[in-house]
């Protein structure tokens, strides 16, 4: 199985939002409900059922070679967020309708014609990516441009990115490229750059790798994303063990009682 992936490098992002526009245009996604919230200069604010690529503006990244809390040293951290297409996908495991499937590119695809709008995938996503449309009622998320990949084309967002902040390719190749990029950044004096690739977590890695500066959680990248069904499996295992022990205990007590004369 071919494993496609994104590498999104925040140090190259200029905040142009061309990826957002290309995603909406190619996938014919309706306009989102934009509003000024006072939290950022970004009016789309977050990923949603109608925003599958979202360029976030994170305030407070120090300039290269400077530090401290001086406002003159502050700058914007820009990152194009997207569905992570987790190796162990909580949304896929929680869906009772079979609307979410694993494709031949190892991405997670949500079939809108199968979705029943139950919302289990929404609460099962550790990244808050999957969302229900307020008008339609069904869930939607990034498709990884499945139709374009089948035609051997690059996903729309990566195709239009003018700075190569969004790169598309084989997962392992992009992992190597990310580590090479970190080495280059540190050679240039950018010591706070890091790779977000949560391999040793319950999602077992993602097919969207990120390079960010500063705290990763500031970019909606949790340090330990958890798949809810992982805990559910553990609970069922514990319950089965307890039930088995109870059954054995009951059987022993019954046989013991049967051997005594009344």
Summary of predicted features, one role per range:
Residues 1-262:
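Non-ligating segments of multi-cofactor redox enzymes
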């Amino acid at each position: 199985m071919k494993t496609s992936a994104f590498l999104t490098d925040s140090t190259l992002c200029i905040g142009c939002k061309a990826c957002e526009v290309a995603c909406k245009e190619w996938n014919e996604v309706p306009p989102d409900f934009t509003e000024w919230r006072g939290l950022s200069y970004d009016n789309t604010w977050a990923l949603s059922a109608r925003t599958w690529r979202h360029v976030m503006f994170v305030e407070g990244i120090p300039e290269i070679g400077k530090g401290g809390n001086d406002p003159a040293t502050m700058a914007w951290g820009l990152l194009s967020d997207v569905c992570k297409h987790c190796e162990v996908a909580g949304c896929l495991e929680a869906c009772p309708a079979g609307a979410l499937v694993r494709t031949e590119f190892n991405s997670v695809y949500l079939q809108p014609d199968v979705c029943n709008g139950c919302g289990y995938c929404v609460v099962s996503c550790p990244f808050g990516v999957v969302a229900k449309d307020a008008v339609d009622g069904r869930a939607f998320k990034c498709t990884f441009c499945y139709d374009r990949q089948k035609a051997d084309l690059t996903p729309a967002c990566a195709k239009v990115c003018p700075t190569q902040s969004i790169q598309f390719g084989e997962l392992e190749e992009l992992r190597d490229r990310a580590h090479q990029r970190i080495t280059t950044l540190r050679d240039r004096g950018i010591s706070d750059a890091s790779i977000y690739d949560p391999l040793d977590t319950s999602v077992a890695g993602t097919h969207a790798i990120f390079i960010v500066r500063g705290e990763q959680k500031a970019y909606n990248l949790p340090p330990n994303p958890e798949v809810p069904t992982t805990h559910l499996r553990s609970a069922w295992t514990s319950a089965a063990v307890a039930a088995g022990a109870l059954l054995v205990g009951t059987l022993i007590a019954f046989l013991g009682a049967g051997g005594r004369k009344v």
